[in-house]
Amino acid sequence: MEIMKKQNSQINEINKDEIFVVVPAFNEEKMIGETLKNLKKEGYKNIVVVDDGSMDKTSEIAKKEGVIVCRHILNRGLGGALGTGIKCALLYKPKIIITFDADGQHHPKDVEKVVKPVLFEGYDMAIGSRMMDKNELKNMPLVKRIGNFGLNFITYLMGGYFVTDSQSGLRAFSYEAAKKIIGDLKSDRYEVSSEFIILAKKHGLKLKEVPIKTIYTEYSMSRGTNVITGFKILFKLIMQKIF
């Protein structure tokens, strides 16, 4: 019985050397060092930081942490940064590619939560949802909750799966899924989060959501989407659908 338990735990063991973490960053000198240190403490050594035209010391701090740094001369937006980072990670042929926000809102321990469905349950993509845990949901400001639900619905209407947190920055892709999605990716800005889900459905990829925790700070709350960004996402998704 003990031998069987040991064998099962070995089968479900995550080899973190086969995982690449992509961290898009724009003017993140305040948090990028801590974010990278925390990821490395959890055993994630293969990290790609995409400095999306920052005007501060984001690149210098990331380089000191010994990670791969790709730098855009001009700011291209979240979609542009993620596209560059995923393409870079694909060159190393990892089993799993993770996207992870630079602003400190994600727990590095939650990376395993999105990895497991892809590695062990036959899913092609997993999203860490801030909306599945009722306690976490209470911590999210009402405006963000309403905006998130609206964008979830829009993502579904535009041809994607209906998910609880379409705008989450914590995701896992299998190598094959990332290759399929990156070949069709058009978004340069925040609409990329919805486009990932739309393309997942287009390619018939199996997607799972898992609950994650979020670290809400004054700093992390100042980043990400707002009402104006939400309308921009809607407009760009409609344009992509038409053209």
UniProtKB/Swiss-Prot annotation:
GO biological process terms, semicolon-separated: protein N-linked glycosylation
Cysteine disulfide links: none
InterPro entries noted in UniProt: Glyco_trans_2-like (IPR001173), Nucleotide-diphossugar_trans (IPR029044)
Pfam families tied to this protein: Glycos_transf_2 (PF00535)
Superkingdom as given in the UniProt entry: Archaea
CDD domains tied to this protein: DPM_DPG-synthase_like (cd04179)
Name of the protein in question: Uncharacterized protein MJ1222
